[in-house]
């Protein structure tokens, strides 16, 4: 179940430059109607204001106790999503809503989840999504603008509005845990009965603090931790320091012969190809988003986000198709 939305009076404010209309009403707090009546509660009382007393060790214990409860709970997960960009978060949203019984762990190397979806292209703030990706915006309640003269795409006034809304919904699900500032260093594997590396079963991920991962070359060895899961979904983006990690690891494991390598920018070709081909590329490992372009040699798409969102939807669908079978195989 989605978390309850804050109740505000709607105020529609489309961008005049786009000659647009907002198809999902924007919501801003109306003066004097704050749901929590914060000014009524605190206003004019600051001279007597005081926080409840606390001892520093209470904070340390509460914080670490809660975190280690999550570590213990999600050490055996049902699905692990690697990468919390627009594709990974969309995947998590669909999965958590469809299957509240599944434990879903999201691993994100950065302190701040969201990947490149905090801004549009070239550090511009607006986000463009080609139709029919606006269906997902309606699903999560993100307002967007459309231009009647250009009906094939919609515009979100700030990419951060999309990312923050999606992230808040994902993290509100009780069956989802985000481990940020955490890097995936390797994959947990199981050999196939035939011994063929191409049939290797993926059975989880090997993790470490990102700061440790970044300094393996200049510090003494620091062993990692593990999370078991019958299905891993990798959405780490195109090649980079942490990008396309699982795709590259499949090659070094001989599960995939070689990477296709991302081609030049072609929005029309790239977005359709990424969504249609999001799939299980190895037993227990589904790859979506721009990471898939490194496997299959698809074009890059640049600053248009519809394929990232809908690749996430398809990744969730693919995961649900194979979950029961992969769970049985991993239990053997």
Swiss-Prot record:
GO CC field: cytosol; nucleus
Subcellular location: Cytoplasm; Nucleus
Catalytic activity entry: [ADP-thiazole synthase]-L-cysteine + glycine + NAD(+) = [ADP-thiazole synthase]-dehydroalanine + ADP-5-ethyl-4-methylthiazole-2-carboxylate + nicotinamide + 3 H2O + 2 H(+)
Annotated family: Belongs to the THI4 family.
InterPro entries: FAD/NAD-bd_sf, Sti35, Thi4_fam
Protein's recorded name: Thiamine thiazole synthase
GO biological processes: mitochondrial genome maintenance; thiamine biosynthetic process; thiazole biosynthetic process
Sites bearing 2,3-didehydroalanine (Cys), chain numbering: 221
Cofactor, free-text remark: Binds 1 Fe cation per subunit.
A GO molecular function held by the record: cysteine-dependent adenosine diphosphate thiazole synthase activity
PTM comment: During the catalytic reaction, a sulfide is transferred from Cys-221 to a reaction intermediate, generating a dehydroalanine residue.
Pfam family, one: Thi4
Superkingdom, natural source: Eukaryota
Keyword terms, alphabetized: Cytoplasm, Iron, Metal-binding, NAD, Nucleus, Thiamine biosynthesis, Transferase
Cofactor section: Fe cation
Main location: cytoplasm
Parts forming coiled coils: none
């Amino acid at each position: 179940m989605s978390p309850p939305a804050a109740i505000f009076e709607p105020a529609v404010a489309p961008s005049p430059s786009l000659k647009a209309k907002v198809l999902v009403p924007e919501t801003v707090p109306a003066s004097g109607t704050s749901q929590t009546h914060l000014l009524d509660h605190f206003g004019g009382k600051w001279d007597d204001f005081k926080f409840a007393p606390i001892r520093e060790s209470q904070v340390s214990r509460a914080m670490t106790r809660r975190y280690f409860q999550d570590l213990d709970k999600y050490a055996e997960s049902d699905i692990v999503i690697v990468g919390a960009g627009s594709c990974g978060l969309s995947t998590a949203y669909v999965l958590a809503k469809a299957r509240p019984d599944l434990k879903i762990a999201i691993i994100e190397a950065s302190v701040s989840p969201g990947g490149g979806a905090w801004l549009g292209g070239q550090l511009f703030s607006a986000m463009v999504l080609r139709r029919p990706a606006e269906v997902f915006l309606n699903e999560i309640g993100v307002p967007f603008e459309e231009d009647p003269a250009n009906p094939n795409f919609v515009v979100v006034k700030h990419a951060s509005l999309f990312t923050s809304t999606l992230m808040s919904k994902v993290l509100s699900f009780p069956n989802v845990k985000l481990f940020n500032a955490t890097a995936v260093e390797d994959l947990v594997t199981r050999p196939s009965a035939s011994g063929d590396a191409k049939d290797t079963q993926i059975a989880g991920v090997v993790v470490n603090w990102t700061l440790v991962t970044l300094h393996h070359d200049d510090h003494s060895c620091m062993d990692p931790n593990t999370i078991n899961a019958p299905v891993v979904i990798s959405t780490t983006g195109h090649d980079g320091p942490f990008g396309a990690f699982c795709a590259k690891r499949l090659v070094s494991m001989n599960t995939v012969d070689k990477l296709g390598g991302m081609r030049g920018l072609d929005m029309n070709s790239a977005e359709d190809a990424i969504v249609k081909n999001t799939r299980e590329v190895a037993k227990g490992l589904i790859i979506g988003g721009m990471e898939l372009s490194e496997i299959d040699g698809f074009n890059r798409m640049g600053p248009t986000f519809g394929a990232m969102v809908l690749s996430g939807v398809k990744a969730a669908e693919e995961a649900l198709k194979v979950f029961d079978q992969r769970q049985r195989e991993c239990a053997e």
